[in-house]
Amino acid sequence: DVKILASHSKQRGIDSSGIVTFQDAKYQIVRADFEVTKLLQKCKWQSSSIAMGHSRLVTNGMSDNQPVVRDDLFVIHNGIVVNEQEIWDSVSSERLFETDSETILALAIEYMKDKQDIEGIGQYILSKCKGTISAVLAIPKLGKLILFSNNGSLYVGNKNGALYFA
């Protein structure tokens, strides 16, 4: 259940949190500088067809809590991209935030410029990033969520027809 996942995610940190819900045909994003279980109480996630959350310690980037949103995409990322400057030097997107997670979006934008489908986007991003990544990339205009990881810390389950991941 969502409350249990949120409670377990506090182990990752309580410095900041963010929740994405999908309601009335649009995504709603709420961020806070406190733990995710408190934020969950402030959201109307129960009536959403999609609810995703993130909890973290501040490690790389003191602001710009997740999810990171730009160019009609968003990402929730657990890990650290250690070659972020190398990535920024190789893409045409301009950096907007002070978080390494934005590099995942910049790479997704580059990939989608040249490709008609998104089949290999997760592998492309993982091939360009050095560090640890478990992420969900959302492409709302295509109605797609892409899960990918290079460290095995992405867990997926199904309960009563609902997809859960952590």
Map each language-model feature to its residues.
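Conserved short alpha-helical segments that host acidic/polar catalytic motifs at enzyme active sites
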Residues: 1-166
